[in-house]
A protein has these predicted regions:
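A short, well-structured beta->alpha microelement
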Residues: 139-159, 436-437
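Active-site-proximal alpha-helical
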Residues: 252-284, 511, 646-739, 747
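Beta/coil-rich, acidic/histidine-enriched accessory regions frequently appended to metallopeptidases
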Residues: 305, 309-355, 362-363, 704-756
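Catalytic cores of extracellular degradative/oxidative enzymes
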Residues: 490-493, 497-681
Length: 756
């Protein structure tokens, strides 16, 4: 079966028979006694400062969580512990837990409890690995210190004066991990803290983020102890404590998940969604050397109808579908490391991102990337498409150091959603590392449009080099480039190219839409001239040149948040209909615009310096109003989106103009800006934005109060009017110092508000 083949290839799993007994396991049976010691006199714990810790997963018989955050399917461990042979280990989801907790006295008291618990004595001797100087200074009145060490090999371990090692960072090698493991087995204690999701941001040699399952040294150590650091983030401010409630245990969740997959009789204590979520967090982090849990879930999935449970026409896969959820997860993880020649087409790939017609030619094409394109950065479109599970061969002339290849534009990951209309993760990006023959092979189980991504050091660099590539095994995709006479001349032929996804390109915007939506598009020139003008509007309002990198917009059938979201690319729904796209409906775009498109690109254009608390969904809509006027002839004050907002100010003023209410209502807040625009036009906004750009970086406002002051003074200076009374009327706090800066101007208030 597919799942069996994929997993056995990539994970090198032993046979399910290696599991041994199948009776119930007393997961975390000793947790109560240990947590009583760890949480003695602790009433509350919370996030350390402004850090975002990662997840800690407990899955072994002798491991348990001490603190978690959230609830239901979204509950995540953040501090875990385990006993291992004669020793003990305590794991934190971030090193900042050691650096001044920021959660009151209980945080520091908990660290004292933790060190004593790990040592099994009141006055342990503590060594610090790869840091911990601040912690040592704070704790020196409580414990004897045996030193600070940058290398595990230098640690004085058991028999040499150390009871507990506090591991603050670094990445010891396999030999050093062995020393720490032996230290714990012999009765030593280890406290470690690391941000696992932060490590995923570090690129490996293949152009991928670090894999916490294979690359995170800490997981290689604590995995054998029944703990792993997972890839989820835990941003909650307050934590659940084991002294107050039962916390999740992935071993127990695994029992429930297997029962749900195999249809075993008996009611489970853990709901399907929670079981699947907990096991998913474990499987994404569990080292491949595990010979118990991975084979167990693989064996259960092999007996299920996995391929029938993936998303398809008229069928979503719910997170609570344990077999579908975990089957897709394990297959996705397996395919990451599978050699290109052995990557299969994923079940459901023909549904999305889509099928390639039978008989479509696989072609070889040479592509030249100019130095200018390399400097611009971003994804460089090729007009080529990789079929699901089909090998793409790349060769380069003049070297490809630092270059990456991307397959697929639909980059949103959906694992956090309650249900999936498509596989949750369907794109890949790889470093171009040529084999001795000078070529590189890659395959995606889902297929997708092919892009080249320039080296980071080339982006914006005057001396950036271009590159020449040969791509073999791809299918031609519809592609139009505004300003290229050949592209316009050959459009009627190119729009019939067989790939299921098309791209329309101009200097400022690239649209990625279903090919079916452009098969009848006769005038791509007029359409992309519209989008070029739209792209120009954003820097035009901000008073700055067009950015070098074009914006991108990609249609999808499901995205990670909302109906649309900002970023690179802007992601939007719309692919549900393969024969239609609002992005190519020029008649509607020129008469009504598209508030959603303009809004999301407005997020990309807004600046922190003039966006303070409560205006994240406001300052971007200045661009929505501007483009509505420029691209569809809609007067900003008469924009339909404002129609439902115009009655709000009177009610707000009548209630006393409370700033907290203002910040909670983006439509109300936008009226404050729109009223100025109505009476003075766009020029003062352009003048104010340009003043921000021209100001020294050291003068950039940082706090909300500074941003509020600066926005009032910049706009007052642009208008040559004192806006202090206007801001006061709206309830937006301004300091007396800022009021004084513009007091020499004539005060202004809209006519309908009365005299200032």
């Amino acid at each position: 079966m597919l799942i069996s083949v994929c997993l056995s290839i990539a994970l090198a799993l032993p046979s399910p028979g290696a599991l041994g007994g199948s009776g119930p396991t007393p997961w975390g049976a000793e947790a109560g006694d240990h947590n009583e010691a760890l949480l003695a006199n602790i009433t509350a714990l919370g996030r350390p400062g402004n850090s975002i810790p990662g997840e800690v997963v407990a899955f072994g018989e002798n491991s348990f969580l001490v603190a978690s955050a959230g609830g239901g399917d979204g509950e995540r461990g953040v501090i875990g512990a385990a006993t291992f042979h004669r020793g003990r280990v305590l794991v934190f989801g971030h090193s900042s837990f050691f650096g001044g907790w920021g959660a009151g006295a209980d945080g520091e008291a908990f660290l004292l409890n933790s060190i004593r618990w790990a040592a099994g004595k009141e006055q342990p001797r503590v060594a610090f690995l790869a840091g911990g100087h601040d912690l040592a200074a704070r704790l020196k009145v409580h414990f004897a210190e045996t030193g600070h060490y940058q290398r595990c090999a230098d640690l004085p371990l058991r028999g040499s004066g150390t009871d507990v090692v506090v591991w603050v960072g670094g990445a010891p090698d396999e030999e050093q991990i062995g020393r720490l493991s032996a230290f714990v087995k012999g009765g030593g204690g280890v406290l470690l803290g690391v941000c696992p999701w932060g490590n995923q941001q570090i690129w490996d040699g293949q152009g991928r983020g670090k894999n916490i399952r294979t690359d995170l040294s800490q997981n290689q150590l604590i995995g054998e102890m029944g703990l792993v650091l997972g890839d989820a983030t835990v941003g909650d401010a307050a934590y659940n404590l084991a002294s107050n409630r039962a916390l999740p245990h992935a071993g127990q969740a695994m029992d429930a998940a297997v029962a749900y997959i195999t249809g075993s009789e008996g009611e489970q204590e853990i709901a399907p969604g929670s079981a699947a979520s907990q096991v998913a967090g474990l499987l994404r982090a569990l080292p491949a050397s595990d010979d118990r849990f991975l084979p167990r879930i693989q064996s259960a999935l092999e007996a299920s109808s996995f391929a029938e449970r993936v998303p398809g026409p008229g069928h979503k896969t719910r997170k609570s579908d344990v077999a579908g959820h975990l089957g897709m997860l394990l297959a996705t993880e397996a395919w990451r490391d599978t050699p290109a020649s052995r990557v299969p087409a994923a079940p459901g790939a023909d549904f999305f991102p889509g099928a390639i017609p039978s008989g479509a030619l696989r072609i070889t094409r040479s592509l030249d990337v100019t130095p200018e394109e390399a400097r611009q950065g971003g994804w460089i479109s090729t007009g080529l498409y990789a079929g699901p599970g089909e090998v793409i061969r790349i060769s380069a002339t003049g070297g490809a150091a630092g270059w990456k290849l991307r397959i697929g534009a639909h980059k949103d990951k959906l694992w956090h959603k309650d249900s999936w209309s498509r596989w949750p993760e369907i794109t890949l990006e790889r470093q171009l590392v040529m084999d001795p023959g000078g070529s590189f092979e890659v395959a995606s189980p889902f297929g997708g449009l092919i892009y080249f991504v320039p080296p980071r050091n080339a982006v914006g660099a005057a001396g950036a080099n271009g590159a020449s590539f040969m791509v073999a095994g791809a299918v031609e995709a519809p592609l139009f480039r505004l300003g290229d006479p050949a592209s316009a001349k050959n459009w009627k032929q190119r729009r019939a190219a067989p790939a299921p996804w098309a791209e329309l390109v101009c200097d400022g915007m690239i649209l990625t839409i279903p090919s079916g939506a452009i098969r009848e598009l006769d005038d791509p020139v007029a359409l992309m001239e519209y989008w070029q003008r739209a792209a120009d509007c954003y820097p035009e309002l901000r008073g700055e040149p067009q950015p070098a990198r074009a914006e991108r917009m990609v249609e999808d059938i499901q995205i990670s948040a909302g109906w649309m979201h900002s970023g690179y690319p802007v992601m939007t729904h719309g692919a549900e209909r393969a024969d239609h796209s609002a992005a190519v409906d020029l008649d509607t775009l020129t008469t009504a615009g598209n508030w959603g498109y303009f809004h999301e690109f407005g997020h990309n254009a807004q600046k922190r310096e003039w966006t303070f608390s409560g205006t994240g969904e406001v300052t971007n809509n200045l661009f929505s109003l501007y483009l509505g006027e420029q691209m569809a002839g809609i007067e900003p004050w008469n924009n339909p989106w404002l129609a439902g907002q115009k009655d709000k100010p009177a009610e707000y003023f009548a209630k006393g103009s409370k700033f907290s209410d203002w910040k909670r209502s983006p439509g109300l807040a936008l009226m404050m800006y729109a009223t100025i625009q109505r009476d003075f036009g766009w020029e003062p906004f352009q003048t104010a934005f340009k003043a921000y750009l021209e100001a020294p970086a050291a003068e950039s406002p940082k706090t909300d109060a500074q941003k509020q002051d600066r926005w009032m003074t910049r706009m007052s200076q642009a208008l040559e009017r004192d806006l202090g009374p206007y801001f006061e009327y709206w309830g937006v706090p301004i300091t007396e110092a800022a009021r004084g800066e513009v007091a020499h101007f004539e005060p202004w208030m809209p006519e309908e508000y009365g005299k200032p």
